Amino acid sequence: MTPDQNALVLSFLLTVGGLIGYLRKKSKVSLIAGTALGANFAWASKLMERGSSQGINYAFYGSLVLLASSGPRFYKSRKPVPMILTVLGVISTWYFYRLWA
């Protein structure tokens, strides 16, 4: 998969995850964070598709935000959803850092 496709997959997963969090638990934070990060990764994907190096920047910093927000939640709660988000954050940060650096 190309970097823009990876960013698009993350966009989809985060947006759907935020929507599910809202529908199941009425969590407005999940909805806002999921759609905001999802939009960030969608925009990053579009920029990468157009050949702009700014897309990598958006994806890398979005990955850092995902990791920084989910890591402490997983450390504190040890629940599966924060764990999955943390793993996604670690992998995506590593992946986009390699492209960014």
Curated annotation (Swiss-Prot):
Main location group: endoplasmic reticulum
Membrane topology according to the record = Multi-pass membrane protein
User: Would you say which domain of life the source belongs to?
Assistant: Eukaryota
> Which range is the signal sequence, renumbered to this chain?
none
Q: Where in the cell is it found?
A: Endoplasmic reticulum; Membrane
Gene3D superfamilies, sorted: Transmembrane protein 14-like
Family affiliation: Belongs to the TMEM14 family.
The name of this protein is: TMEM14 protein homolog P14E8.05c
Species this protein is from: Schizosaccharomyces pombe (strain 972 / ATCC 24843)
